[in-house]
Design a protein with these regions (language model features):
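Conserved phosphotransfer cores of two-component systems
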Residues: 42-44, 68-74
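Two-component/phosphorelay signaling modules centered on CheY-like receiver
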Residues: 11-29, 97
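Active-site residues of response regulator receiver
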Residues: 8, 52-53
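Helix N-cap/capping motif at the beta->alpha junctions
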Residues: 30-39, 60-61
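The C-terminal output helix
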Residues: 117-126
Length: 126
């Protein structure tokens, strides 16, 4: 099964995401800050990366996604966000270029798994 890296500074979200994905048969590696997230992605080469858009670190999820893309990491990136709902903004791939898909917080297990499966299938087609 696919390996997924989940990077989020909120341990509740990190634990819930891991539990949801593992229950569906995915291998999950986690990090609770951008530095550790960068390291685990480089070390484990996951099939999918899940990032929180805002983390209490100098680098947020968007900066980390940009860093991966600049280094040639083509792995699909799904981003957790609560910003679009709070600001009434509709995120799109064109606006947030390095990210392939978004999931709104609070996270729906079915929506998360659906988007993960969609991105993994799309990556296999390439």
């Amino acid at each position: 099964m696919a390996r997924i890296a989940v990077i989020d500074d909120d341990t509740d979200i990190l634990d819930a995401s891991s539990l949801i994905l593992k229950s569906r048969g995915f291998e999950v590696v986690t990090a609770n800050n951008p530095d550790d997230g960068y390291r685990i992605v480089k070390e484990t080469q996951p099939d999918l990366i899940i990032l929180d858009v805002i983390m209490n670190e100098p680098d947020d999820g968007f900066v980390l996604a940009q860093k991966f893309r600049k280094e040639g990491v083509a792995t699909p990136i799904l981003m957790y966000t609560s910003i679009s709902r709070a600001l009434g903004i509709e995120f799109s791939k064109g606006i947030m270029a390095p990210v392939d898909e978004f999931v709104e917080k609070p996270i729906s297990p079915d929506e998360l798994v659906s988007k993960v499966e969609k991105l993994l299938a799309k990556a296999k087609e390439k």
